[in-house]
């Protein structure tokens, strides 16, 4: 009797661990990262990224070995106090932030070998709207996605360049971004920037302002060459 109970207990524990690993595989902080990014989830099960402590320039760097967003969406916690989100309701303060230490730029850098599947909304819990750069050299598939409370949103297959703690630009050598049939809603952001070696459009991108840079290139934070969104079918900038 004890053996049967023990076997059932072990089976339950295994299934719980297995399910946690499957969930965690969608979003995994790079174990080799030097930054203190932590993962959590809301009471309703929405994944939360407690962003790393920003430097004195207001830059928060967050490195992942796997980075994906499913239909539940995802919350970037840039708040030093309890706050309410659209996706996950009430969220506790980010323990990595001291009072008045919110980031003004959040970099999400994927160091693994898989492309990112972005199939839900990304929301920033932040007193002020924040800039976000999502970088994955392996590529990104974006479908039925959008942003909430993000000022400027950049998705790229390039390498993010930093100098003296400042973001200075992006170098692109490879990588494909695919916009899926359900498209991307960027209307909550001031502008959306897509920077990749190649871009494949299967659906619409709707934004207030859209910048697209393709091919092998280097862009800076102050000067880049972009394709006019009006020249690309399926892309609409108000």
Task: Describe the function of each predicted region.
Residues 1-10:
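Bacterial N-terminal signal peptides that target proteins for export
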Residues 23-238:
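Solvent-exposed adhesion/ligand-recognition segments of exported proteins
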Residues 11-21:
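Bacterial N-terminal signal peptides
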């Amino acid at each position: 009797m004890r053996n049967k109970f023990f076997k059932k207990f072990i089976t339950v524990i295994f299934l719980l661990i297995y399910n946690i690993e499957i969930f965690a595989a969608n979003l995994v902080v790079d174990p080799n990262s030097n930054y203190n990014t932590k993962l959590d989830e809301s009471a309703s099960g929405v994944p939360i990224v407690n962003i790393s402590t920003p430097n004195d320039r207001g830059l928060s760097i967050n490195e992942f070995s796997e980075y994906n967003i499913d239909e539940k969406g995802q919350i970037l916690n840039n708040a030093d106090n309890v706050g309410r989100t659209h996706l996950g309701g009430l969220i506790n303060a980010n323990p990595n932030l001291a009072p008045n230490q919110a980031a003004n730029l959040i970099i999400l850098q994927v160091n693994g070998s898989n492309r990112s599947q972005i199939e839900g909304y990304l929301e920033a819990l932040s007193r002020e709207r924040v800039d976000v750069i999502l970088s994955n050299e392996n590529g990104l598939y974006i479908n039925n996605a959008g942003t909430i409370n993000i000022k400027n949103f950049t998705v790229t297959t390039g390498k993010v360049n930093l100098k003296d703690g400042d973001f200075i630009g992006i170098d692109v050598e490879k990588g494909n971004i695919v916009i899926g049939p359900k498209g991307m809603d960027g209307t909550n952001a001031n502008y959306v920037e897509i920077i990749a070696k190649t871009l494949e459009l299967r659906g619409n991108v709707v934004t207030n302002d859209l910048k697209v840079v393709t091919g092998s290139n280097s862009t800076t934070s102050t000067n880049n060459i972009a394709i006019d969104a009006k020249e690309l079918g399926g892309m609409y900038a108000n």
